[in-house]
Amino acid sequence: MASRAVVRARRCPQCPQVRAAAAAPAWAALPLSRSLPPCSNSSSFSMPLFLLLLLVLLLLLEDAGAQQGDGCGHTVLGPESGTLTSINYPQTYPNSTVCEWEIRVKMGERVRIKFGDFDIEDSDSCHFNYLRIYNGIGVSRTEIGKYCGLGLQMNHSIESKGNEITLLFMSGIHVSGRGFLASYSVIDKQDLITCLDTASNFLEPEFSKYCPAGCLLPFAEISGTIPHGYRDSSPLCMAGVHAGVVSNTLGGQISVVISKGIPYYESSLANNVTSVVGHLSTSLFTFKTSGCYGTLGMESGVIADPQITASSVLEWTDHTGQENSWKPKKARLKKPGPPWAAFATDEYQWLQIDLNKEKKITGIITTGSTMVEHNYYVSAYRILYSDDGQKWTVYREPGVEQDKIFQGNKDYHQDVRNNFLPPIIARFIRVNPTQWQQKIAMKMELLGCQFIPKGRPPKLTQPPPPRNSNDLKNTTAPPKIAKGRAPKFTQPLQPRSSNEFPAQTEQTTASPDIRNTTVTPNVTKDVALAAVLVPVLVMVLTTLILILVCAWHWRNRKKKTEGTYDLPYWDRAGWWKGMKQFLPAKAVDHEETPVRYSSSEVNHLSPREVTTVLQADSAEYAQPLVGGIVGTLHQRSTFKPEEGKEAGYADLDPYNSPGQEVYHAYAEPLPITGPEYATPIIMDMSGHPTTSVGQPSTSTFKATGNQPPPLVGTYNTLLSRTDSCSSAQAQYDTPKAGKPGLPAPDELVYQVPQSTQEVSGAGRDGECDVFKEIL
């Protein structure tokens, strides 16, 4: 037994005057509307006849039901679920209205009611503005509860004790209040949601819910389409109607998958629901289906041209003399060029597709002429199907005794999708236009998959008899309709003068076969996989970093062990020569190791030791070291090698370099057989005793024995200039020694340099001082 809604408006205490109820949607279940019989004061009306009429009326109400009143809003009552609202919802409901809904489901079931919104003014403590819910219908009903309140949170559901329940809404004088929206279902639908629930209300990445009938709300909107998904702010059930997974008149189960949002959501028209353009959101949702949603071959060419036929073809000759024919083979979706167009403009025209065998058809996509200069399209149509091409059946929704009218296009270029729920199992499909713009013209594509019968082999059908070209162009006879399913086209229908869409187009259908290609089918598996991979990757990266750090430390430690030092980069040709003076020489003999002693060290020596040192057979004079001249010195070291401390030394460190003394240090003589001391420098001043400052002079070093090569380059220049200065400065005496090899005198005395008067000006003195410091 289908659900029913009875709406009564009472204003007169003696005679109920029935006001015109708010028009119920044409797709609502049990659309018959009956009013209560008026009161009569006639005394001639016999009592038995009145009781008989009352009994007949009660039987009619029991079978069909009625909806009356002025306080009812959006109402869809299905056999297992439905949705109802107060009048003007979500705007403020008017004063002094009343509406009563009586809901009945099949025997053995109970009713569950859930509220999506409740906002009834409670200023009068629920005396004049309230919603009452009763168990049962009629005089035997018992009250479950009386509810009012602004913004009342009714999260719990209300259940009936039997298969019947009554809702009574009453409004008096009030200021505010949206009213209410409620949905119901049979008790076994534990996961019932309302038409206002969105994806953002649920935290699970995947979930399944039951959508009630009637969720195609006139005030709600969605954003998105398939297969890209819907914005998370879209109502779930309305998006399910648009996607084709549930029917607006029946409701159904949906399986939702949540994923990351996208920057832009497209607008599209499908199943009488228009989705609007949406912008970036944090998440989106889509629906899991079985996947029977592929194209059947109109666009791809799998369906051959002879398999596409029509009632008539539009042909004409233009002003240039060219013949134009918009044949049925041009009715392929997304193919450039003109569409199929009918020659006649009446409701007997059709476009037929032969699939060669039975297939499961889940939907259809249509478009107009796709030509801006020809604004032709079909705005409403019916679907007929057949197994043999002779006996045709009009598509209807389950439990509805009216033909399903599908909404078509609103312009000449946009694609519009409609789904079949339940799907059609047939070989032949006909599209019968009922409304159009100017001319009947369209392109189309069928959606579905192969049909595999369960428990029986595929049914083979014979192809329809061939048709000649004259029949194709001029056929206006209506198709044969199966008895009991749809009326026959026996009388010509009057063409419609307007393109107004009929009320039946608000009924929607759905397809269970939509696949989402942008969302992973199982999020929990991905989470488990990530929980395993992340620790493994962290361990691998940590191990790699440790290996690199250990290798770096080992390399540095190896360098320290080998004692490698970095040297400054000098010229490759002379860097080694310049380093010879800093590197210790490998002494072959004791005599080859030159030693330089400072004057302070000589002073520490006793006279006996000095005499012994000066009694060398041969003495060589060490060449002076000039700071900054690198690569021209032949002696590798000027330090005496450590041979142990002697008693005559006062310095603790024998390698201590000479300090800055107030007097000049003298070079020590270097004997050949023993420690060699630098020999005195003999300056040959005979050639330039009175040379002026501007004239260069020549000085030489004189030594006995093996004489090293003279210094050249800058060093000679410096010596020459020094000689020129020596004529005006103090002279140093040479030691009083005889020929090499002769015994030295008892005591060796060096004269202290004597200061003299300045010979030249301040400029000459400054110049000589500079060179003196260099030497």
From Swiss-Prot:
The chain crosses the membrane at residues 529-549. Disulfide bonds join C72-C99, C126-C148, C215-C237, C292-C449. Keywords: Disulfide bond, Glycoprotein, Membrane, Phosphoprotein, Signal, Transmembrane, Transmembrane helix. The keyword Transmembrane helix applies. One of its GO terms (cellular component) is plasma membrane. Residues 550-775 are cytoplasmic. GO terms for biological process: intracellular receptor signaling pathway; negative regulation of cell growth; wound healing. Residues 187-285 form the LCCL domain. InterPro entries: CUB_dom, FA58C, Galactose-bd-like_sf, LCCL, LCCL_sf, Neuropilin_MCO_CoagFactor, Sperma_CUB_dom_sf. Highly expressed in testis, heart, skeletal muscle and also in cultured vascular smooth muscle cells. This is Discoidin, CUB and LCCL domain-containing protein 2. It comes from Homo sapiens (Human).
